[in-house]
Amino acid sequence: MRPLLEKIARGLELSLEEAYNAALAILKMEAGEAETAALLMGLRVRGERAFEVAGFAKALRETCLRIPVNDPYVIDTAGTGGDGLRTMNVSTISALLAAYLGVKVLKHGNRSVSSSSGSADFLEALGFNISVKPETALLMLNNHRFSFAFAPMYHPAMKNVMPVRRRLGIRTIFNLVGPLANPGLVRRQVLGVAEAGIMGVMAEAAGLIGYDHLLLVHGEPGIDEVSVFGRTMIYEVKGNSIDKYVIEPPELGLRIHELRDVVVSNPMESIEKAKRGLMGVDEAALDFIAANTAMALYVAGKVKDPRDGVEAVKQIAGNSNDFWSYVNNVAAVSRRDSA
């Protein structure tokens, strides 16, 4: 580890293999706490590079509890979190909607850190058992098109890093690689990024990892979601190619709203906001949901144009009983399993 620390201190980039070996040493507790803290802080201060993010992601994928997904069209909507703006849990409701509309979704996520409602909190409030075993997760995915992979359960080695991360109290490279380490090794994903400045690095890292189709999104005024409050910056990764562009709500056929209209204080408020949106009585919530679901449908190859995805969601608005029945049924299936 010391040669790597010296390399970082000199401002040099670690190779993918060096980063991978460093991450493995940390995850397997072969590195001391001081070395781990020094490496994480050194990378953050200098700025993480693509090979380093890819190397850490490779190690995290290797040490996870695997869900043996073989379908290349399964998607995820996990993001970095950390925007601190306490918006409704749109990535999870969008994942459920995408599944209802025919896409297989293996949602990877955790409890809230900086938001009012993390994906795990939101799903628990809906009645889901968030700790299903891999065989149940795969069964749910194949039979019901939706399953959840609770990050602490599927990445047990991460508990070895938590004491150092808590003491540091800042964003580290592990915040970046967590969303890139879905236990099903999905090849398609909408990945929200709270920190716009790292999107290019994450896009390059995703190209090294080997995604078929990945959308990195960062929306105004600083959310790790597709925004209906201003512009959304997007890095679109297909294999080794990366395209960068910006979209605005009117391009999706949506209005521009105020962020305060989708802020919630707890998971139950997030559910109520989603229900009101899909009833057609909360336009801001509906448009926020539609924009993010549209990108999930697009990355899955279900629609060729995100505007068609928006239209698919709008058709549910005002007549969402079947959708909520679907959600309740999937939640009931999850409760039959106990880890």
From Swiss-Prot:
Q: Any idea which positions bind 5-phospho-alpha-D-ribose 1-diphosphate? A: 79, 82-83, 87, 89-92, 107-115, 119
Enzyme category, top tier: transferase
**What name is this protein filed under?**
Anthranilate phosphoribosyltransferase
Q: Could you tell me which SUPFAM superfamilies the record lists for this protein?
A: Nucleoside phosphorylase/phosphoribosyltransferase catalytic domain (SSF52418), Nucleoside phosphorylase/phosphoribosyltransferase N-terminal domain (SSF47648)
Single Gene Ontology BP term?
L-tryptophan biosynthetic process
Q: Which family does it belong to?
A: Belongs to the anthranilate phosphoribosyltransferase family.
Q: Which cofactor does it need?
A: Mg(2+)
Positions bound to anthranilate 2 = R165
Q: Which reaction does it catalyse?
A: N-(5-phospho-beta-D-ribosyl)anthranilate + diphosphate = 5-phospho-alpha-D-ribose 1-diphosphate + anthranilate
Its annotated pathway?
Answer: Amino-acid biosynthesis; L-tryptophan biosynthesis; L-tryptophan from chorismate: step 2/5
Q: Which keywords belong to this entry? A: Amino-acid biosynthesis, Aromatic amino acid biosynthesis, Glycosyltransferase, Magnesium, Metal-binding, Transferase, Tryptophan biosynthesis
Which molecular-function annotation in GO is an example for this chain? Answer: anthranilate phosphoribosyltransferase activity
Q: EC number(s) on record?
A: 2.4.2.18
Q: Could you tell me what the cofactor note in this record states? A: Binds 2 magnesium ions per monomer.
